[in-house]
Regions:
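OB-fold ssDNA-binding interfaces and closely related basic DNA-contact patches used
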Residues: 1-86
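Residue-level detector of solvent-exposed, low-hydrophobicity positions
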Residues: 14, 19-21, 90, 100-101, ...
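Residues that cap or initiate secondary-structure elements
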Residues: 35-39, 89, 123, 143
Length: 167
């Protein structure tokens, strides 16, 4: 069992309410991490997958084909790396001071956070891989709101600027 902590910015965030698409309820986040901070995590994940491949090799020593590998739980975008971390259960989150976030607080994309995750290797029909499970998290910069927020200003309160041109 490999438990690690990672810091990044949420690109997709279903941490306050579960994603109920495709008939399942899952809490998850895609965490964008700078490449220089992500390399250690990427190497650890590859080691876990490698250990699973070794175990599969022990159980099928006469296999002549390459073992099927599942997609890794991260995507290398060059300057940044996106980590896919999830949980079946609502993860516990804390603010910068260590106080638990209330149920009413909604964590939106662009929030920056530390997430403690457990990296777990697997060998299933889809292939050999690794899954990252959210254990808990701490918010650095919270971006929140509700679905009723309008991205536009109140036009009645905004006064148009009158510009005079000199000819």
């Amino acid at each position: 069992m490999h438990i690690k902590q990672i810091y990044g910015t949420a690109k997709w965030s279903y941490l306050s309410d579960p994603d109920e698409g495709f008939g399942s309820r899952k809490y998850h986040v895609v965490l964008e991490v700078p490449k220089n901070e992500a390399t250690e995590h990427m190497a650890d994940i590859k080691k876990i997958v490698g250990a699973e491949i070794v175990e599969q090799g022990k159980t099928t020593p006469n296999a002549t084909t390459k073992f099927k590998e599942a997609p890794l739980p991260f995507i290398d975008n060059g300057e940044t790396v996106d980590f896919k971390i999830h949980s079946q259960f609502k993860p516990k989150f804390f603010d910068r001071t260590g106080k638990a976030l209330g149920e009413e607080v909604k964590i939106w994309k662009d929030s920056s956070m530390w997430i403690t995750y457990k990296a777990q290797g697997y060998n299933k029909g889809m292939g050999i891989g690794c899954t990252l499970y959210i254990q808990s998290g701490q918010i650095d910069q919270l971006v929140t709101g509700n679905s009723q927020n309008c991205p536009y200003p109140n036009r009645d309160e905004v006064k148009p600027e009158v510009k005079q041109e000199i000819v």
